[in-house]
Amino acid sequence: MSVYKYYDLIRKPIITEKTTSISEQNKYTFYVNKFAKKLSLKRAIEAIFKVKVKKVNILNIKGKKKRFKGIIGTQINRKKAIVTLEKDHNIDYAGGIK
């Protein structure tokens, strides 16, 4: 699979206080395409970030019900991946920011 296809699998990294604290354990969190599988995510992260992936955990997040001007609607469903890297590898999210 080409590298451009891998970019379609990974939507964006999740950078919060909680995900920053688990990054010390070599775990990184991403929103991913809802059709992505564990093996394809592993290959995509290894190709894009040039790291060795140990394990991938996936969570399906159901959209919340919200009310806007009296009309009840729902937010979109999402898929989240928690990627565990090998011991000496890490991902620098802000590597290109100056």
UniProtKB/Swiss-Prot annotation:
GO terms for cellular component: ribonucleoprotein complex; ribosome. One of the early assembly proteins it binds 23S rRNA. One of the proteins that surrounds the polypeptide exit tunnel on the outside of the ribosome. Forms the main docking site for trigger factor binding to the ribosome. GO terms for biological process: translation. SUPFAM superfamilies: Ribosomal proteins S24e, L23 and L15e. Gene3D superfamilies: 3.30.70.330. It comes from the Bacteria. Belongs to the universal ribosomal protein uL23 family. This is Large ribosomal subunit protein uL23. HAMAP family: Ribosomal_uL23_B. GO terms for molecular function: rRNA binding; structural constituent of ribosome. Keywords: Ribonucleoprotein, Ribosomal protein, RNA-binding, rRNA-binding. Signal peptide: none annotated. InterPro entries: Nucleotide-bd_a/b_plait_sf, Ribosomal_uL23-like, Ribosomal_uL23/eL15/eS24_sf. Part of the 50S ribosomal subunit. Contacts protein L29, and trigger factor when it is bound to the ribosome. Disulfide bonds: none annotated.
